[in-house]
């Protein structure tokens, strides 16, 4: 018997409910069609809904407590992960909602009101027309509310308000008027403008009004809600001793506040109660005047200096940003485990904050001008502001009655003291150094105002004390510290990113003590706080280039910084690049996404670690700051006019040219982090200077050696301060962005997870502050378009380098949504680069400071009459060449990064070769200059070898235009193209003079061109092998700027990997696997893998891959594995070590290096490591002629190569020219970029394994080519033996690490590694068995070569008998080993979660093969 409940569900699932509106029309709630009563007789009940729709219903989350139905978007989000099925049933699922009867036209509201307004789409009814109109937008997807900052559109104004609060901190430009309306609690913490729960929001919004009118309202399940009293506005909000109201007490004792509680407050009662505001203000001010005393201590949550205390009557709640419940979030100081930077914290420069109350706080501030006793005159306001600044200049903590958001705070901002105590609090009794983290970061105050206050403090101390004594009896003016006509209103709610300048941050200690004693000797004073954030009147502001608010006109200041003449900011860039931060939501707080793939709390965390390290100034820096302070402390009329550039030159002499992370840089990092405008979140911990220097060295050796776009000579304190010399002296964030990011990448490559995430968070914040200051500067500076130097762009080179590193770090996120966000960040960076290179000038990005002077000097007309000596002039030319190369290299590195995403994960290309235009690539001679650490090292080399700088700066050669060279080289791969000898000679000359990274860019360009359908016929193997002939060899210098040995050529290894991967992609299309492997859509991943198996099966007549292509695939995959996982050295450098200056030695090595691959495998290096051939394919078994062309001319024409070029010997031909020695030793890999090719290599090897298995099953055919089958089985054996060698190595490494020999691995990690060792490697024997175990301990020659010199029938039969063991278990073994290798890289080499994701993708493919074993074998 079916119960009534099940019967009702059955009808809801399989029968379209038919409802009637008040007009008499019948509406099908599933299809949305309307039938009039006249046609009612023709209406029939439709057939049951499809199974897919039924499945969607089963996944619905029914919300019976609130009496509302599930929104269409939620039903869609609850479906299965099959995108195709979900797309087919989206429309049906949206409309097929189970609307409760009480929510239709037949029901009433909880207060008894009839529902008169019916939705014509879903039959939902409402009691008010505006509720229906808002609900209808959930069907029409209309989004009329637009953000004024980032242009995002929203369907409801409350969503826009929440977006403005979360991402733009209530910025004025985001929304013209902030309406105080209740905002839905965010369930997931995102700022999506999706209408997932639009209907539920409407029901709650409607019902809460009914609850206010009726106290007997109940929910659907019969549970009654208590009637909340009408909200009252009172200034006791700012008194932490007040008794909690009933509304707060009711919900404070539960662990999580409900959404309804945060919405039951309405703004209308607040306005009604505003009449009593004046009385409350006067009462509080009188109370403050009577109860004036010093507060000795303040309760701080977990040691934080944010000045926010715990209010026990309020509990922690979710991330809702309702205007009525904003105070609940400003007091929401999380527990340590919540606020600590977890492993899912990778972000890019967007603030996250806890918004203060919009309703209570804003209403109070809006009524301040009406309070009796407050002056409205501008002059009085200016005087009060000046006095307030002067009196508070020596304080070392912020005023407790001003929130960290720059406006007056609510009750949670205060400690357990009353209003009067906080008003009279003085912190002069604390003789501690001023810490920048104590200052409220969003106070709007200019540098000149601070200087005037300091000057007044020194020269008018008697008058100052008198004014303070008078202000004690005038609490209405002094205690509030408000003096502007345009007090904060709804239309001018904003924030500022500027903190107290360093004049106050480094205030002399003796002045502080003196002032403190003077203050304590007199009467107790009321504290004069800094004024809260306001929007200044237009005539009060003067535009200044440093981005700070200008001085009042009535102030006589002659110490203004001169306006820079060479600034040409690109406003489009400012709006575009700042989206990099605005789109990302998660911060150094819970809820972010993980770059590391785990959720463990960092080991270096501390419950008291809520602030920056102490801003301890080094003695030299402290003296400098005292001198600067004394200079600025003179009366403003006596201050000299000093040119900013001249002052920068004077300071440069005090900076180190050998180290980057000095005490001075550390001090600026602390100050920059102290200016971060968001309160309530932890400040990252900066490692010691020694650690930072170590990370810098790792960055140079392991990162710049692969992607050389920053010259190491630029990574010291002197150069950093010089290249940022044009920035405002108080803008510390400009100086510390690039150093922090270099240390971040170094910590990542050093596998220090804690330091990497802390350093990245610090760099993210500093970039955000700098970008905001850039926008402010560009807006305020009216003359920035009148710069004299038109060659300089407004985008500094160091900023492009910093953004590139930041995007690269955050690119491989654990959350696919944030992956898309970071891709948009890269696209914004690409747009900036494309815009910058369109000017066709030599300078794409501005060179500041000395670099700019060098360029101008060397390119001036009177350069011939220079007074510089030749030696000094050569040094200038050398440095200028490094600067010009940096301009070009950053463009090509960003192009390579964008193209890499296309290669690895099929991300659409947004920076093409067509965008590069006529950009010339660096020549080999210029690259030689780049490889020297500095000019002194080049000078030493030139003296020994009788070389001059002109030999390397030979301008007679034509520039190598990258796009033209690429398109010409592609023609060599087209069979019917006729290339003239002149063109071929020109191309040969250019390739002979091309630098290494230029060859790597050419491979990326070839891959891009192959994506076009018209270029599918290009023979990629021919083109790439032709390029390899000209790949530059090391010059035998014996050293390089990357501090690597001469035989460690990482760029050449990258080139070989790119060539192998491009060849693989030209044979088999892996686009179906690439996207899903990154996004972890495992169902689509396995389906696409199945399509690949079917498309390339032996029985498919449409299979475009023949047996020879499969041999090439196997060879390329084996090469990829060896190049990434084994020790690789440059064989050409090894020969040069024996004879550096013998020019004939190079050709002899090229001729003899590959005469016999078997002989190469028997050679040993100095350490006794045995060489293995990375590219040995033993194609000689088929053609017996792989050595016949070895003595050809080295640089012969490509047409001559075609005579001896066939598809059997491509890998040996490539091996002949690349000259890489690969040893049997497995080496720790730090190749962050190219190591991701392992996923593709193992995936292709698994497809190759299935193909060989099926090929062997069909071997009984009389038409089978036994020779090819033998070669296929031979490659298969090579793959399995290589994996067995890796298995032995991984077991040893995991055992060593688990036993405590991993170097600093703690016990928890040891236990985890032991468990992993037991789980991951125990079942490998089941997959692999002992088929090849007898050969496991044989030498390398036997391991890699199982062929004989003769091809007898017995040998073939023996191989066929051996190949019968190559079943599905071997394919599973290949995938399992790929999973283990990727997990090993993640566990012990690079804590980058993309490797773990790729390993999981291989695991899913393996599980799919196990589940479909019968299909594959059949």
UniProtKB/Swiss-Prot annotation:
Please share what else the UniProt entry notes about this protein.
Targets a different set of genes than S.cerevisiae ADR1.
Which stretches of sequence are listed as region Disordered? 34-96, 181-285, 403-426, 454-484, 1132-1167, 1338-1362
User: How does a null allele present?
Assistant: Affects filamentous growth.
Q: What is the lineage of its organism?
A: Eukaryota, Fungi, Dikarya, Ascomycota, Saccharomycotina
Sorted UniProt keywords? Metal-binding, Nucleus, Repeat, Zinc, Zinc-finger
Predominant cellular place of this UniProt entry's protein? nucleus
Where in the cell is the protein located? Nucleus
The name on file for this protein is Transcriptional regulator ADR1
Organism expressing this protein natively = Candida albicans (strain SC5314 / ATCC MYA-2876)
Q: Which domain of life is it from?
A: Eukaryota
* One matching Pfam family: zf-C2H2
Which BP terms in the Gene Ontology apply to this protein?
A: cellular response to starvation; ergosterol biosynthetic process; filamentous growth; filamentous growth of a population of unicellular organisms in response to biotic stimulus; filamentous growth of a population of unicellular organisms in response to starvation; regulation of transcription by RNA polymerase II
Q: What induces it?
A: Expression is increased in biofilm.
PANTHER family recorded: MIP31509P (PTHR40626), REGULATORY PROTEIN ADR1 (PTHR40626:SF28)
